[in-house]
Amino acid sequence: MRFKDQVHFIRRNMKKNRLRVFMTILATTMACAFLVVLSSVGFGIQKTITDMTMSQQIVTKVSVMGKEGDKPIKKADLEKYDHVRSVVERTQVYEPNKATLGNRTNESSNLIFTNMNDELKANMELEKGRVAKSENEIVVGYDFAKRLLTKKESEEYNKKIEEAKGNPEDIKEPKGYTKDILNKTIELSVSKTDSKTGDVTKTKTYDFKIVGITKKPSQDWMEDSNIFISDQFKKDFSEFLDFKGGNVETNIGVFADKFENVEQLTNDLTDDGYYVTSVTTELEGANTFFMVFKIGLIFVGCIAVIISAIGIFNTMTMAVTERTQEIGIMKAIGASPSIIRRMFLMESAYIGILGCVIGIIISYGVSYLVNLAVPMILAATSGGDAGDLNYTFSYIPASLVIIAVVICGGVAVISGMNPARKATKTNVLTALRREL
């Protein structure tokens, strides 16, 4: 019997009992959809956490916090590792400063000294302009201009904060400097304070030209009003502010040449005694947790698939009983037991896979509706905006589809094995005599 004839025989027999086959496929569809949708919640939460982690930092950056035995960290040593594009050392100063542009001032910026050539190698992300090339050029944060306020705007804003009584989020912030700040020259005043009294003891003023603006932060709640100054000024500032105190913080970042090498670079640094953190280390623990979580959800979903397998088993058992004469005739004309077994297993697999395919299609629709409706519901209950909830509540990757097909198809075949084995053991004489 040719394979084409076997398929024709299976389809003809399934059409004889359309209602029973339909109900069996429906049960399989519901079980598969339940498995996929339930598991997609775990995949969705993991995707949300991963995307948030990836968006909040530079993915190729490996932060170096220290070394075993409190040994000094040498920039030259870090540059020798494989796959290193650049090593950036940033020194942040915690002293009062005021940036002035015309009648506007910004007193909420942090001063960061860095090597601009290293920043250029590390592909410093800019919204506008370029990386500073001369010592009197600076790069400012995306929100720097927004913090340039007139004296009147500052006083009104501070007054509203005092009147808000602990609810500053309800206050509308002033727009600040709305024109293009690129290529503008600002006056930067830096003050030295007494460590005991907190009073200002000295003040020094510098003129800087803004040649670059950093990229907009990935999250709406994040703000960047930093001022990046060439480290050529570091010595001058150090003598004035006395960097030996606790008013400075130095951060070292090692940038890999591409994301695929971040994990290897992180492992190499860790093996040599460096205390590091990167995207891969932050996601490692989360991935382990979500792996266990997803396995648990898939296991729960498998219970529904196993229940649907009972329906497939009953359907195939009834099919063998009803086709006793046909089985006897096929055996009488020379059909081997393996062909008969294959035909019933193919029918069982057909029911399982068809139900699985329909279930997956339905799952994608349910997943889309969940991601559309849940943010609206949460926004309505919390009084916020649905657009602010940039979360994925349900996500169906290709791996989940493959898992669902394997589970449903495998369970369907296993459910049909016993009826198929029973069909091969049918006695020819008994089958033909029964019909007479």
UniProtKB/Swiss-Prot annotation:
Induction notes from the record: Negatively regulated by YtrA.
The organism's taxonomic lineage, starting at the top: Bacteria, Bacillati, Bacillota, Bacilli, Bacillales
Sample GO molecular function, one term: transmembrane transporter activity
Function: Part of the ABC transporter complex YtrBCDEF that plays a role in acetoin utilization during stationary phase and sporulation.
Location relative to the cell: Cell membrane
Name recorded for this polypeptide: ABC transporter permease YtrF
Lipidation (N-palmitoyl cysteine): C32
Gene this protein is translated from: ytrF
Lipid addition sites, S-diacylglycerol cysteine: C32
Membrane-topology annotation of the record: Lipid-anchor; Multi-pass membrane protein
Record text on subunit structure and interactions: The complex is composed of 2 ATP-binding proteins (YtrB and YtrE), 2 transmembrane proteins (YtrC and YtrD) and a solute-binding protein (YtrF).
PROSITE patterns, per the entry: PROKAR_LIPOPROTEIN (PS51257)
Gene Ontology cellular-component annotations: plasma membrane
Pfam families given in the database record: FtsX, MacB_PCD
Region forming the signal peptide: 1-31
